[in-house]
C-alpha cells in the first residue's frame, strides 16, 4: 500500500443531520480484516437516504454499495476467492456508522470487510458490479437464515413450493427471485404492471399487481391457501398487512428488510422477523434503536458460508444484476439521486454513479 493520499473526498454527515460533500476526509485505517479499495462506482439504496437526522453521525462517511480496485490488504484478510492488489472487487460496507466513521461507500477510497467482499468476474461491468453488495448480503440473510426456506442454490429443494416476494421489481426483489429459482422453489411476486416482464425475465413464475384490492385473494387461490414464506422487499406498514393476508390458513414466516410496528402482527400463527445487512459482519452496530446490535458470531459464520456460495454463483454466471441507470454528477449527483429515491421517482432500475478519481 504505497503512494496513496492521506485524505480524500467523501459524502459525510453534517451538524444539522443532512449529508454533504467534504474534502480532506481521512482515509480508512487498514485493519487486520480490511481490504482498502480505490472506489470506481457506487449504487444507491433507499436506506442511504434514510441515514440522516438522528441516524446521521457528524463526519461519518455515508454509503453502502461500491465497486473498485484493491490497493491495500490487511494481514489477516480471508475472502471467498483469493484477492490480490489490483483486483476488481465489490461489496457493501456499513456507512454512516459512528463506530467506524471513516468507512463508507460514497468516497474515493473504501475500507471493506473481507468476508463480505466479492471478486468481480472479468465479464462483468463496473456498473453492474456496483449493484451487488448489500443485496447479496441482505437477501441471503433474509432467505436462508431468517425465513430459512427449504432449499439452497447449491442444494435445491426436493419439493417446489411457492415463496412470495413482495416488491419483485426492486433490486433486492429481482435478486431474491433468482435465488429462490436456483434453490428449486417457485418465486411469485408483486409489482406494477409495467414491470411484469422485468420480474418474469428474472424467473418469477407468477406476478400480481399489488395495487388491486383483490390481489391477496388471487395469491391465496394460486397458492391453494398454503403459502408459508413471504419476503417483503418494500417493508412498509401497508405491505406487511398485504403480506399477512396472503399467507395460508396454517400460518408461516414473514421477513421484512426494515423494522415493522408490532401492532401489525395480527396473526399468531405467523412468525415475523426483519433483517439488518450489517449484522453479517459479526461486529457491534452503533446505530440508534432499533438498529443497535452486539456482534453475533453465528451470523458471521453464516456470512462466510453465504458469500462463498455467492462468489461461486457469480463466477458461474448464475446471477443476473438489476437494470442499471448510469447517472452523472459525481458526489453532488449522488445527493440528488438520494432525493429521487426518497421521492420514489425510481422504478425497476438501480442508480449508479461513477466516483471522481484522485488527481
Curated annotation (Swiss-Prot):
Residue positions annotated to bind NADP(+) are: 47-50, 169-172, 192-195, 210, 257-258, 346-347
The UniProt induction remark is: Expression is positively regulated by the fusarielin biosynthesis cluster-specific transcription factor FSL7, probably via its binding at the 5'-CGGNNNCCG-3' motif present in the promoter of all the cluster genes.
User: Which positions bind substrate?
Assistant: 134-141, 277-281
Please summarize what the entry says happens upon disruption of the gene. Answer: Abolishes the production of fusarielins F, G and H.
Matches recorded under InterPro entries: ADH-like_C, ADH-like_N, GroES-like_sf, NAD(P)-bd_dom_sf, PKS_ER, Trans-enoyl_RdTase-like
User: EC?
Assistant: 1.-.-.-
Q: Which UniProt keywords apply?
A: NADP, Nucleotide-binding, Oxidoreductase
What the protein does comes down to:
Trans-enoyl reductase; part of the gene cluster that mediates the biosynthesis of fusarielins F, G and H, decaketide compounds with 5 methylations and a decaline core that act as mycoestrogens as they stimulate growth of MCF-7 breast cancer cells. The initial compound in the pathway is produced by the reducing polyketide synthase FSL1. FSL1 lacks an active enoyl reductase (ER) domain and biosynthesis of fusarielins relies on the trans-acting enoyl reductase FSL5, before it is released through hydrolysis catalyzed by the thioesterase FSL2.
Name it.
Trans-enoyl reductase FSL5
> What organism does the UniProt record list as the source?
Gibberella zeae (strain ATCC MYA-4620 / CBS 123657 / FGSC 9075 / NRRL 31084 / PH-1)
Organism lineage string: Eukaryota, Fungi, Dikarya, Ascomycota, Pezizomycotina
Amino acid at each position: 500500500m504505497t503512494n496513496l493520499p492521506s485524505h480524500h473526498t467523501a459524502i459525510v454527515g453534517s451538524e444539522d443531520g443532512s449529508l454533504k460533500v467534504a474534502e480532506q476526509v481521512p482515509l480508512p485505517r487498514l485493519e487486520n480484516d480490511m481490504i482498502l479499495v480505490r472506489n470506481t462506482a457506487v449504487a444507491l439504496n433507499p436506506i442511504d437516504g434514510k441515514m440522516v437526522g438522528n441516524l446521521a453521525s457528524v463526519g461519518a462517511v455515508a454509503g453502502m454499495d461500491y465497486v473498485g480496485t484493491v490497493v491495500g490488504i490487511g494481514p489477516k484478510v480471508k475472502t471467498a476467492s483469493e484477492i490480490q492488489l489490483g483486483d476488481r472487487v465489490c461489496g457493501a460496507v456499513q456507512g454512516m456508522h459512528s463506530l467506524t466513521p471513516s468507512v463508507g461507500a460514497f468516497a474515493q477510497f473504501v475500507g471493506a470487510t473481507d468476508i463480505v467482499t466479492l471478486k468481480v468476474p472479468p465479464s462483468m461491468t463496473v456498473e453492474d458490479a456496483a449493484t451487488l453488495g448489500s443485496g447479496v448480503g441482505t437477501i441471503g440473510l433474509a432467505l436462508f437464515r431468517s425465513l430459512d426456506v427449504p432449499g439452497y442454490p447449491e442444494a435445491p429443494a426436493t419439493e417446489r413450493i411457492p415463496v412470495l416476494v413482495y416488491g419483485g421489481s426492486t433490486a433486492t426483489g429481482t435478486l431474491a427471485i433468482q435465488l429462490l429459482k436456483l434453490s428449486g422453489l417457485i418465486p411469485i411476486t408483486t409489482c406494477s404492471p409495467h414491470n411484469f416482464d422485468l420480474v418474469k425475465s428474472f424467473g418469477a413464475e407468477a406476478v400480481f399487481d399489488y395495487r388491486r384490492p383483490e390481489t391477496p385473494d388471487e395469491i391465496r387461490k394460486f397458492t391453494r391457501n398454503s403459502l408459508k414464506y413471504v419476503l417483503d422487499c418494500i417493508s412498509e406498514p401497508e405491505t406487511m398487512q398485504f403480506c399477512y393476508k396472503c399467507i395460508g390458513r396454517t400460518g408461516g414466516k414473514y421477513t421484512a428488510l426494515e423494522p415493522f410496528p408490532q401492532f401489525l402482527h395480527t396473526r399468531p400463527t405467523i412468525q415475523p422477523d426483519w433483517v439488518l445487512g450489517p449484522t453479517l459482519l459479526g461486529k457491534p452496530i452503533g446505530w440508534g434503536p432499533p438498529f443497535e446490535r452486539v456482534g453475533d458470531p453465528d451470523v458471521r459464520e453464516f456470512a462466510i458460508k453465504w458469500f462463498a456460495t455467492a462468489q461461486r454463483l457469480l463466477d458461474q454466471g448464475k446471477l443476473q444484476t438489476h437494470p442499471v441507470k448510469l447517472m452523472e454528477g459525481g458526489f453532488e449527483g449522488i445527493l440528488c439521486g438520494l432525493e429521487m429515491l426518497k421521492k420514489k421517482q425510481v422504478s425497476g432500475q438501480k442508480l449508479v454513479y461513477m466516483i471522481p478519481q484522485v488527481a
